[in-house]
């Protein structure tokens, strides 16, 4: 089994692969205060319930792949792999890790590991040109060229951040449930806020993707040839309202981690 771990700013997602198939997954809160020992106990509690794994941490795991946007958590996970997984090969996606995707940025080291991993998965599963829209703490748009290169992207505030800002900065507004309203024209303050978030973000996605697709296609190219893939925990909120999303792959980042691990596997032989 291959254990993949995607550490985001808000949530950490763990996925278990048997070959190419993801057979189990877990989502926990990301807490920078957790120590390596606390993470190990939490992971053992989750994975110890799986019938294909043993009761000891590391039983049944032949490899580990990790990407993280929170440096302190990455440090602790590195310690987890060293102390609790012994000789199990581990790939941590960071500058210098072999991904197979050229990064055409002014400073490749500043690109988030999760964004690179998403590009790896998109290029492998769908080919290029493609745009990955990841609905997380931030909403990110990442562009993959027809040659499979990572060429850049867009970062905007995420859905939950925007809703929290409304509740904090609006004197007569409050925190509300993140849900699709009955109509665009809200009949209550709650519905009006929900409408602003859901349809506002759908419009943002459609507008940004249209502009990115035109740039990716280039002179004489067809922007409609650009494949648009949605991922991230909040993607379902916008999926039914956006007119540009072609595919939804909730496990895109975990799949990308599997691919990066496989591309680095020969060095473990």
Regions found by a protein language model. Give the residues of each.
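ATP-binding/phosphotransfer module of carbohydrate and carboxylate kinases, centering on a glycine-rich
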Residues: 1-4, 34, 162-269
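Short glycine-aspartate micro-motif
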Residues: 2-6, 63-65, 130-134, 229
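Short glycine-rich, Thr/Ser-proximal phosphate-binding strand/loop in the N-terminal lobe
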Residues: 2-45, 56-59, 148-175, 180
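Short amphipathic alpha-helical segments
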Residues: 16-18, 77-80, 144-146, 241-243
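Short, acidic/turn-prone active-site loops that include or flank metal/cofactor-
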Residues: 28-34, 95-96, 117, 155-161, ...
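Phosphate/pyrophosphate-binding loops at sites that engage ATP/ADP/AMP, CoA/4′-phosphopantetheine
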Residues: 43-63, 208-225
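Phosphate-bearing ligand-interacting subdomains
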Residues: 47-55, 61-82, 86
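Phosphate-binding/catalytic loop of phosphoryl-transfer enzymes
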Residues: 79, 87-91, 96-169, 198-211, ...
């Amino acid at each position: 089994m291959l254990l993949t771990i995607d550490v985001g700013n808000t949530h950490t997602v763990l996925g278990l692969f048997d070959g190419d198939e993801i057979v189990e997954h877990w989502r926990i809160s990301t807490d920078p205060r957790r120590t390596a020992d606390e993470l190990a106990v939490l992971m053992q509690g989750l994975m110890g319930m799986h019938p294909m794994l043993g009761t000891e941490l590391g039983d049944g795991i032949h490899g580990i792949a990790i990407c993280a946007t929170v440096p302190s958590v990455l440090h602790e996970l590195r310690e987890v792999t060293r102390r609790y997984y012994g000789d199990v090969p581990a790939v941590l996606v960071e500058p210098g890790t072999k991904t197979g995707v050229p990064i055409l940025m002014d400073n490749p080291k500043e690109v988030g590991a999760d964004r690179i991993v998403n590009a790896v998965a998109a290029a492998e599963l769908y080919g290029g040109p493609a745009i990955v829209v990841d609905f997380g703490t931030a909403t990110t748009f990442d562009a993959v060229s027809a040659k499979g290169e990572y060429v850049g992207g867009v970062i905007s505030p995420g859905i939950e951040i925007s809703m929290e800002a409304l509740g904090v900065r609006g004197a007569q507004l409050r925190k509300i449930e993140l849900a699709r309203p009955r109509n665009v024209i809200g009949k209550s303050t709650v519905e009006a806020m929900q409408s602003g978030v859901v349809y506002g973000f759908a419009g943002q996605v459609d507008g940004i993707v249209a502009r990115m697709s035109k740039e990716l296609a280039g002179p004489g190219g067809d922007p409609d040839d650009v494949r648009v893939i949605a991922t991230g925990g909040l993607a379902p909120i916008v999926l039914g309202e956006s007119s540009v999303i072609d595919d939804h792959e909730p496990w895109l980042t975990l799949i990308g981690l599997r691919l990066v691990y496989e591309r680095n596997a020969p060095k473990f032989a």
